[in-house]
Amino acid sequence: MSTPKKDKNNKEVDKTDVKTPVKVRRAKKKICAFCVDKVERIDYKDVAKLKKYISERGKILPRRISGNCAKHQRQLTVAIKRARHIALLPYTAD
C-alpha cells in the first residue's frame, strides 16, 4: 500500500486538486480617433463629436475608456469645458 502524497503544508494532495492554467485574455489596444483623422485641434463647437466622449451622467470619459492619446485627451477636456461654459453642452445629464 502506498501512502498518500502530501504537500509542503503536510496536507494530503489529491489529483483533482491540481489547478488548470487560466487563459489570459488580452484586450485590444484602442487607437486615438483624432490621430487617425490627423486632427490638429479639437473644435469646441463640434458638439456631435464631443458628445461621444461624455458619459450618460455628463462626465468626461477617461483615456483608458475613450482610447485617446494624452495630447488629444487634454485638448478634448479643454474643448468640452469650453462648450459647457458657453452652454453648448450640459454640465450634468438630465
UniProtKB/Swiss-Prot annotation:
Keywords: Ribonucleoprotein, Ribosomal protein, RNA-binding, rRNA-binding. Belongs to the bacterial ribosomal protein bS18 family. The lineage of its organism: Bacteria, Bacillati, Bacillota, Clostridia, Eubacteriales. PROSITE patterns: RIBOSOMAL_S18. GO terms for molecular function: small ribosomal subunit rRNA binding; structural constituent of ribosome. The keyword RNA-binding applies. PANTHER family: 30S RIBOSOMAL PROTEIN S18, SMALL RIBOSOMAL SUBUNIT PROTEIN BS18M. This is Small ribosomal subunit protein bS18. InterPro entries: Ribosomal_bS18, Ribosomal_bS18_CS, Ribosomal_bS18_sf. Disulfide bonds: none annotated. One of its GO terms (biological process) is translation. One of its GO terms (cellular component) is cytosolic small ribosomal subunit. It comes from Acetivibrio thermocellus (strain ATCC 27405 / DSM 1237 / JCM 9322 / NBRC 103400 / NCIMB 10682 / NRRL B-4536 / VPI 7372). Binds as a heterodimer with protein bS6 to the central domain of the 16S rRNA, where it helps stabilize the platform of the 30S subunit. NCBIfam families: S18. The keyword Ribosomal protein applies. It comes from the Bacteria. Part of the 30S ribosomal subunit. Forms a tight heterodimer with protein bS6.
